[in-house]
């Protein structure tokens, strides 16, 4: 649930507080951590390429990273910006596509990203310290 904890001498109980689940009934709609975990769980069930797809590295720099999981002509691309400033990425598509769908766009705290598919390449603009999953479509 994104609860901060503090390790104390002789005990780690503060790291694992007792929770009343009734206090978190709307956490998926209000808590960014719970929202993303719930979405990732759903996507693992809905997108077999995430579990069974071949791993393909698409780009790697000191600040950004993109890789795909590809299965039966379908692909999901994970894009990461570990830097403190926005980043533009461009890389070859692992499968033919005419567009992308941001699979985490509905999560609490998600930010808009710009994407463009052109000439077999994907261009992505990511905010600082941000990541998402993109399904290639078309």
Predicted regions and their residues:
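C-terminal beta-strand-rich structural cap/linker in extracellular carbohydrate-active enzymes
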Residues: 115-138
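Solvent-exposed beta-strand/loop surfaces of large extracellular or lumenal domains
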Residues: 101-121
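A residue-level signal for conserved active-site and pocket-lining positions in enzyme catalytic cores
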Residues: 40, 100, 129
